[in-house]
Amino acid sequence: MRDDRALNVTSEIGRLKTVLLHRPGEEIENLTPDLLDRLLFDDIPYLKVAREEHDAFAQTLREAGVEVLYLEVLAAEAIETSDEVKQQFISEFIDEAGVESERLKEALIEYFNSFSDNKSMVDKMMAGVRKEELKDYHRESLYDQVNNVYPFVCDPMPNLYFTRDPFATIGHGITLNHMRTDTRNRETIFAKYIFRHHPRFEGKDVPFWFNRDEKTSLEGGDELILSKEVLAVGISQRTDSASVEKLARKLLYYPDTSFKTVLAFKIPVSRAFMHLDTVFTQVDYDKFTVHPGIVGPLEVYAITKDPEKDVQLIAVEECDTLENILKKYLKRDIELIKCGGGDEIIAAREQWNDGSNTLAIAPGEVVVYSRNYVTNEILEKKGIKLHVIPSSELSRGRGGPRCMSMPLIREDL
């Protein structure tokens, strides 16, 4: 890793040095049964316990020597750089919240500027703003009178503790993602300001392989770095094939890149298989956890540079098993460890609770949810060192340790 680079991730398993998390906040308390579909949740976590579980996750990482950063803290620090940046951030946040009334926009600008510090303001933006919190705003316009039933003027962002999805570190750059839904796409504004204005990243060599103003969707849970030369991307419920091509073109043709191939995995379109990292993750040099439903013949496309046409790509279908595809591109024998031991019922249950969604701290050393005890026992028997974290509430959001973390720096293998 070069000294002038703030990011470095060239594998899924290199020793983790720096990671970005978001501690669940009041946005979780603003979930109601009527809002679950709109805000992409299946259940309502108990915030007190969810925070305790998340704190245990963060402490596990720290004890393993990982520097833990928080999204909300970096975002607040990024807009400290100047009042102009802060006002631009507030204005953009309000626009992306879907606020149409000019008077309401003015009231929100005044409200956000009333906070004594930027961290409190960012926390409130993430938590959502209820109408009654704008005490001096008089709802007299047609817009306000017609829309007087819905409780929020700015929706809460309960998915924020899944920091993997809004952006993804690849090599020394990032994909600043355009998420599938408006609900989640709003989350990417924080990363935008962090990477443009935070002193940790401003002026550093941080190329954007994909940007949030694209029209097609890409989410970080579909991006897995198999090696310094091979990136896997899922074509899924949340990521479009067109986005994979855009990412591949930018990444493969960048002058200073080690990546040579992008593997596009077409995975089932369902809630259980939402992202590629919900169906397989790497736990060691030669070992992957995997849902049994994806080990058969797969539709995978190997994307490389066209040697005859400038800035063009070649996509070749690789119709084979997951094991053989990984063996071919990683140039080693591969062992797939089935979630739930391959038992149909156990696999379905533990897959629902992200049994295949592990976070590697180092080769052969991973963080897992306690509730997936069958898969965990199998991993231990395979020689994998486990850091087991409590998960009764965090798992209600349908994401595991990998989903809840965005590595910024890993050691190269």
UniProtKB/Swiss-Prot annotation:
GO molecular function list? arginine deiminase activity
Q: Which domain of life is it from?
A: Bacteria
Q: What is its EC number?
A: 3.5.3.6
Provide the catalytic activity annotation. Answer: L-arginine + H2O = L-citrulline + NH4(+)
Record: active site? C403
Pathway it works in: Amino-acid degradation; L-arginine degradation via ADI pathway; carbamoyl phosphate from L-arginine: step 1/2
From the Swiss-Prot or TrEMBL record, give the protein name: Arginine deiminase
Give one Pfam hit by family name: ADI
Species: Clostridium perfringens (strain SM101 / Type A)
HAMAP family given in the database record: Arg_deiminase (MF_00242)
Q: What's this protein's family per the entry? A: Belongs to the arginine deiminase family.
| Record keyword Repeat present | no
Query: Does the record carry DNA repair as a key word?
Result: no
Intrachain disulfide bonds: none
What GO biological process term is on the record, naming one?
A: arginine catabolic process to ornithine
